[in-house]
Amino acid sequence: MKISFFNFPDDLLYEPERHVWIKVEENKVVSVGMTDLGQYLAGKIFQVSVPRRVGERVNNRTILFSVESAKWIGKIRLQIEGEVVDINERVIKNPSIINEDPYGSWIIKVSVTDVDLVKRAFKNIQDCRSQFEEEANRIVSWKNSS
């Protein structure tokens, strides 16, 4: 789905407040990354840190990753409980690829303990469309007034 000039694939789940997408994969694994709108708001991303290692347990109090750009520094915690199964080293070494391809540049993969909980905790694009539209419209209005 296109909202303003931002893309939001229909097959993903979203956490609009944190500008994060979730993809539920096979075997209870979820991939996590930044939305197109999130990378735009952050500006050029120059550092992504994952303070967890593969095999480590995570929960909703755990920082899954942090992102640093010229405009923003953010630590991302999500309603995910499980075990880290993969970290995208390509993103760690070259974080600006999130700006180029936010949906092809997942950051961390977690084998979750309860997939149904993840599906309830995150929203499909239809359920959070108005939140993203509101934010995108603010950006367009700001750009037009500049």
Swiss-Prot record:
The modification N6-lipoyllysine is found at K71. Its cofactor is (R)-lipoate. Binds 1 lipoyl cofactor covalently. GO terms for cellular component: cytoplasm; glycine cleavage complex. InterPro entries: 2-oxoA_DH_lipoyl-BS, Biotin_lipoyl, GCV_H, GCV_H/Fam206, Single_hybrid_motif. One of its GO terms (biological process) is glycine decarboxylation via glycine cleavage system. Keywords: Lipoyl. The keyword Cytoplasm does not apply. Residues 29-111 form the Lipoyl-binding domain. It comes from the Archaea. CDD domains: GCS_H. The glycine cleavage system is composed of four proteins: P, T, L and H. The glycine cleavage system catalyzes the degradation of glycine. The H protein shuttles the methylamine group of glycine from the P protein to the T protein. Belongs to the GcvH family. This is Probable glycine cleavage system H protein 3. It comes from Sulfolobus acidocaldarius (strain ATCC 33909 / DSM 639 / JCM 8929 / NBRC 15157 / NCIMB 11770).
